[in-house]
Design a protein with these regions (language model features):
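A structural signal for multi-pass alpha-helical bundles of membrane permease subunits
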Residues: 2-251
């Protein structure tokens, strides 16, 4: 019962490490994925060649359909320290590094690599949503602004981004609802060498339940309830901020 929460909050340093990692990885991932999706959608919107635009759009969106097991296998191969690791081979060939880098096995590089992999896999979903919004902006607005002397930058600031604002906030809140759910993406890329920077609440629960001979289902259930509570608070907080900024929320 409540004893589990007392233990969790006062006596378990590993829980707090996992909680900090969860918030850090989740929030940075959310910001990077949303920002990358906005930038890519704006760039794609400038492409006038429809066939080329469709091709690039498909390439960007395709990783979203891949399972995390497949994605992790691909990146473990290309980031390998062996001869099969094309990234290390390329960097050493260019003289950038002298020795191979353990991108997924070094605490200095794991987080950056994790964020890059997440952006590569998940950006396409947001890009589709933002492109759909951009296609709904009336060309008359751009023509009128151009006649008034607005350059491309001003048209972006005063027409495009305000039109995207509602979609950006909606996507942000929808992704925020999943902000505490990092198990699969972390589990397939982490290892014991980087556990201090990669262990999140869900992998902590997994290790506590299945990785030791003394499993405590009551305690791990308490951790799961705490994770769900924090996720709910984040969503409600973001929705409240949306009401203050836009005058309405989506929840």
């Amino acid at each position: 019962g409540l004893l589990h929460f007392n233990t969790m909050f006062t006596n378990d340093v590993f829980f707090w490490d996992a909680f900090r990692n969860t918030l850090l990885l989740s929030i940075v991932k959310l910001i990077l994925n949303t920002g990358a999706a906005v930038i890519i959608s704006l760039l794609l919107n400038e492409i006038t060649n429809l066939a080329f635009k469709k091709t690039v759009q498909t390439i960007v969106y395709l990783p979203h359909f891949m399972s995390w097991v497949v994605v992790a296998s691909i990146f473990r191969l290309i980031l390998s320290v062996n001869s099969s690791g094309m990234i290390n081979q390329m960097l050493m060939g260019m003289g950038v590094i002298d020795n191979p880098i353990f991108f997924l096995g070094d605490v200095r590089y794991w987080r950056g690599t994790f964020f890059f992999i997440n952006v590569w896999k998940d950006t396409g979903w947001g890009t589709i949503l933002f492109l759909a919004t951009l296609s709904g902006i009336s060309p008359d607005l751009y023509e009128a602004a151009q006649i008034d002397g607005a350059n491309r930058w001003k048209r972006l600031i005063y027409i495009t981004l305000p039109a995207l604002a509602n979609t950006i906030i909606t996507v942000f809140i929808l992704n925020l609802a999943k902000v505490m759910n990092l198990f699969e993406s972390v589990f397939v890329t982490m290892n014991d060498a980087v556990v201090n920077v990669s262990n999140v609440l869900q992998t902590y629960v997994y290790r506590k339940t299945f990785g030791s001979g003394n499993s405590d289902y009551g305690y791990t259930t308490a951790v799961g309830l705490f994770k769900s509570f924090v996720g709910m608070i984040l969503v409600l907080g973001c929705n409240y901020a949306s009401k203050k900024v836009r005058g309405r929320g989506i929840v």
